[in-house]
């Protein structure tokens, strides 16, 4: 155990004057840098075009992609809208809102709460983390996030027509070190080089302030998304975006609003029909989708109908759910959730030493910020009508793209100064949390403090690193621990152990301890007792590459099958159209070839794309020869007819002469 009572040195903070100058020209990334908002409910990808960020549409033509991953019985992995569409019939293997589990332990109260409401299995991994299970296989939340990031990567590559390797990925401002590290792991598994992890409210502020006139301004960003809530106070001054404070709740968002409404609907249905829908997974999934839809509709209308015919069945027959939901009733159901956003806003103002009257603009970010009651609450907190200058669903990705352009050197007049959201410290004598870096300290930063031994003859010290605001160490989040050994025996209070905390621009923590007497040093990049090891990450990368290859094969097979079915359809249509022009024996041979090709397609699961291609090509060549001959016959007949008409037309002329 360390003692903070002896040899307490003055705090030493090494300020870094400019993040922009820290990256040398040789370090600048090559190629495009995309910005990705990896959201709980939806994700979005953006790229800079000149000096303007552009949100890229996905394959379905939509600018946001559901952060949903599903695994089918035949081993296919679906991501985005296709995964969400089949959730009702495959709810146990459809993973959503897994961002709420990222970097969390299985025993965390938040995880235990989610266990009761999600249709898929949340399991305890060997390292104690919360993982998920689908089709009998377990996945870390980082892996699931990687599948979504891969979809975003593919979306950008399809638009740009080139490979993309570099990205800036956003995280909730109130994410702790474990959650930030797990997000970086997700990027690595997906094949992306994550240049920077930046906070979502900060990214939204970048999108808001990039093209604004120079001038000092303090703004607040109220970010209520699908799974998390953040509030940040920023000062914008001539291209410098300085975060003054941040606060939030990493387990408060649209998912909780959905759960509250589903709970209400289950209760109403049980009261009316006497049936408990929680026993029926398929009914619950339909109810979840209906609740989400109703929630969205009530942002623009005062009443909505929830109609779910044949929601379930009992001995008396099928049961239907049909009820009206008013905006007022919905606001009553989720009122406590909205109230939970008030205190973090007050704390953020207090920590920034800013009065609400000094806030020039309040930006609304995240899908839930569209709810009228949420907007009214924001107006009450800050005393002004919130700004709608940014798109709540797209601003974060756009800000990430701007930061990517800054790192690439394409945007040179923007400087982002972010903060660490939670205090960092170590456990000292008596279990006290001794803070070395307090919350809302600008990052990157480095700070050292000298401690001593707590007992006579102590030859080693254990450094336990915590993150949080509680006075007792064990009440905070344990990030990791390590030991400094080989300290010469001496009376308590004599040895001098210098502990240094270093937080990089991603908010990732490095800790070192050095015995000043012997010069011995021990240092680690903080990785909690959970988290993914290097070997696990490598295995997941290999698995992702293997899956990518399998997906490419599956895609090729689907494309070949579609091509084959198209050729068969066209051939049969033309055979019908030109039936009287085609030789019967050759038509019969072509029909036999069509039947053979159809047999191959019926057995497509056991056929290779090459075999189907070959059958297609043979069919196409055979049909082309037949139709070419028919065309020539028709042309010859038409030519003969034209000649006869010309001859007939000449005869009257001769008679006149």
From Swiss-Prot:
Subcellular location: Mitochondrion
Gene Ontology MF terms in the entry: ATP binding; ATP hydrolysis activity; ATP-dependent protein folding chaperone; heat shock protein binding; protein folding chaperone; unfolded protein binding
Keywords, sorted A to Z: ATP-binding, Mitochondrion, Nucleotide-binding, Stress response, Transit peptide
Signal peptide range in chain numbering: none
Basic and acidic residues biased stretches: 644-657
GO BP, sorted A to Z: chaperone cofactor-dependent protein refolding; iron-sulfur cluster assembly; mitochondrial unfolded protein response; protein refolding
Reported induction: By mitochondrial stress. Induced by white light exposure.
Targeting signal (transit peptide) range: 1-27
GO cellular component, one term: cytoplasm
Gene3D superfamilies: 1.20.1270.10, 3.30.420.40, Actin, Chain A, domain 4 (3.90.640.10), Substrate Binding Domain Of DNAk, Chain A, domain 1 (2.60.34.10)
Transmembrane segments: none
Cited Pfam families: HSP70
Chain spans, region Disordered: 637-657
Primary location group: mitochondrion
InterPro entries: ATPase_NBD, Chaperone_DnaK, Heat_shock_70_CS, HSP70_C_sf, HSP70_peptide-bd_sf, Hsp_70_fam
Alphabetized NCBIfam families for the sequence: PRK00290.1, prok_dnaK
PANTHER family: HEAT SHOCK PROTEIN 70KDA
Family: Belongs to the heat shock protein 70 family.
UniProt-recorded name of the protein: Heat shock protein hsp-6
Organism of this sequence: Caenorhabditis elegans
Gene designation: hsp-6
